From Swiss-Prot:
Catalyzes the desulfonation of aliphatic sulfonates. It holds the Pfam family Bac_luciferase. It is an enzyme of class 1 (oxidoreductase). The keyword Flavoprotein applies. It comes from Pectobacterium atrosepticum (strain SCRI 1043 / ATCC BAA-672). It catalyses: an alkanesulfonate + FMNH2 + O2 = an aldehyde + FMN + sulfite + H2O + 2 H(+). This is Alkanesulfonate monooxygenase. One of its GO terms (biological process) is alkanesulfonate catabolic process. Keywords: Flavoprotein, FMN, Monooxygenase, Oxidoreductase. Belongs to the SsuD family. FMNH(2) which is absolutely required for this enzymatic reaction, is provided by SsuE. Homotetramer. The keyword Cytoplasm does not apply. The lineage of its organism: Bacteria, Pseudomonadati, Pseudomonadota, Gammaproteobacteria, Enterobacterales.
Length: 380
């Protein structure tokens, strides 16, 4: 099975270490452009743009990067409850047309009650999923060309329609992740690709089986994807050293403060991430080559695959064997790691999209002694 592999645009900041200004870098448009172009150059099929008050707006960033990329797809957030489904559908169709079919959409219900309240959303966890289901129902029908009348518990629209359709037909794909029962029900009923964070394979297997069964009961099939960090080096020993360096500036107070802040979330997925490490630095390899150190201070995806190229590729194939065809990866710092993943990991994977063809003015690598073209090294 060919794999769709995406990268990540760090619109909320980037650096060489977690939880420290040491090795940190300013993230501006020029830097995001570099990361996007590096991802496209290396053969990533798309990029995930994060959402939330700590991030730049994902839609505006994606739109700004369309002219400086050729094939890269942009996975941007749909936010039920903070925007009407009609306006969101219109924006989605426009982004898809402007990018000539390179827009993908990630349904994000939100898991931080404090941040949601700041955005004017005061619904319980259960109510948010009710509203999200109504939103998604309307959004999908509009993009598929229907005129929609809908009277729900949370949303009502009358004679809603789009005058300008999307490029992708019947509509652009819809991604979604969530670990609660309500989230799985929504995924089974309405989304195209269900995302999970990087839990150990056995836990992921159970979760996918539940969603697959729920979808089958609806007469549907759902694709699957996973969100992971990756630390790949020429040797597995070097990769583990890099993992330790990434958290080398974290002290106990920083970890405790981060875990206290994340504990207020009502996201089941976030609770599952926290349970993998328990807020401690001493037992972070939770499954072979799966490391939970990033989750000590980062919300959302908190695990990384660690190893040399063949080892990480083997772990990815274990997830692929569960039915996962889409891998959304990232690494710190995101510019350098995009190249590293492309050079060390991609030769060991069957990719759905290949690196962008280059019209090079010279050979790859520096000429040896002003005479010899560098020899190609075996990937075995």
């Amino acid at each position: 099975m060919s794999l769709n592999v995406f990268w990540f645009l760090p619109t909320h900041g980037d650096g060489r270490y977690l939880g420290s200004t040491e090795g940190a870098r300013h993230v501006d448009y020029s830097y995001l452009q570099q990361v996007a172009q590096a991802a496209e150059r290396q053969g990533f099929g798309g990029v995930l743009l994060p959402t939330g008050r700590s991030c730049e707006d994902s839609w505006l960033v994606a739109a700004s990067l369309i002219p400086v990329t050729q094939r890269l797809k942009f996975l941007v957030a749909l936010r039920p409850g903070v925007i009407s489904p009609t306006i969101a559908a219109r924006q989605a169709a426009t982004l898809d047309r402007l990018s000539n079919g390179r827009a993908l959409f990630n349904l994000v219900t939100g898991g931080d009650p404090e941040e949601l309240a700041a955005e004017g959303l005061f619904l319980s966890h259960e109510e948010r999923y009710e509203a999200s289901a109504e939103f998604t129902h309307i959004w999908r029908r509009l993009l598929e060309g229907e005129t929609v009348d809908f009277a729900g518990k949370h949303i009502q629209v009358k004679d809603a329609k789009l005058l300008y359709p999307p490029v992708q037909q019947p509509r652009p794909p819809l991604y979604f992740g969530g670990s609660s029962e309500a989230a799985q029900d929504l995924a089974a009923e309405q989304v195209d690709l269900y995302l999970t964070w990087g839990e150990p394979p056995e836990q992921v297997k159970e979760k996918l089986a539940e969603v697959r069964a729920k979808a089958a009961a609806q007469g549907r099939e759902v694709r699957f994807g996973i969100r992971l960090h990756v630390i790949v080096r020429e040797t597995t020993e070097e990769a583990w050293q890099a993992a330790e360096r990434l958290i080398s500036h974290l002290d106990e107070k920083t970890i405790a403060d981060a875990q206290a802040a994340l504990a207020r979330f009502d996201s089941v997925g976030q609770q599952r991430m926290a349970a993998l490490h328990g807020g401690k630095k001493d037992k972070l390899e939770i499954s072979p080559n799966l490391w939970a150190g990033i989750g000590l201070v980062r919300g959302g995806a908190g695990t990384a695959l660690v190893g040399d190229g063949p080892t990480v590729a083997e772990r990815i194939k274990e997830y692929a064997d569960l039915g996962i065809d889409t891998f959304i990866l990232s690494g710190y710092p995101h510019l350098e790691e995009a190249y590293r993943v492309g050079e060390l990991l991609f030769p060991h994977l069957d990719l759905a999209q290949q690196p962008t063809p280059l019209h090079a003015v010279s050979n790859a690598g520096e000429v040896v002694a002003n005479r010899y073209v560098p020899r190609k090294v075996s990937q075995s």
